[in-house]
Amino acid sequence: MTDPRSQTPDLATLDDQLCFAIYSANTAINRMYRPYLSKLGLTYPQYIALLALWETDDVTVGALGKRLYLDTNTLTPLLKRLEGMGHLTRTRDPKDERVVRIRLTDQGRALQAQATDALACVHAMASEADMDLKPWIEALNHLREQALKKAQCAGG
């Protein structure tokens, strides 16, 4: 039996797709984080929202969505759940009622210290693989920016 890839050289296989390599790596990394985050009662998207807020607190929903590359319709339910858990507050901006501001609570700020296990896990994985994460992060950030530019040119 012949390899189907040899019969269709112009068609890229799944393993040759950049999008699949990134997607499957992301899935594996999410699985690596899951046991640590479940101890905190968090999902990965909730965790990255908190990471952004630990970096810069008291932001608008729009600014947080832009920082996380999430649409408002995805971010709002996530923030409502975090608010229900007591990690943040959502309040209307007194200067513009259309704007919702996000602020960490004391509980949300305290969670940062507990989340260090998840971060240590990733760094341990990189150390075991003898990898310096900095160049990977820089390359992926550059790739993201280029993809966003192409998406804008294509009207996406």
Where are these regions (language model features)?
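C-terminal regulatory/oligomerization modules of transcriptional regulators
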Residues: M1-D10, A113-T116, E128-G156
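N-terminal leader segment of winged-helix/HTH proteins
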Residues: M1-L40, K134-P135
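Charged, amphipathic alpha-helical coiled-coil/dimerization segments
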Residues: N30, D58, K80-E138
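Central "turn" residue of the DNA-binding helix-turn-helix
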Residues: G41, D57-D58, Y69
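Short alpha-helical "packing" element that flanks the helix-turn-helix/winged-helix DNA-binding module
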Residues: A49-L50
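Helix-turn-helix DNA-binding elements, focusing on the entry/boundary residues of the two helices
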Residues: V61
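The alpha-helix within a helix-turn-helix
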Residues: G65
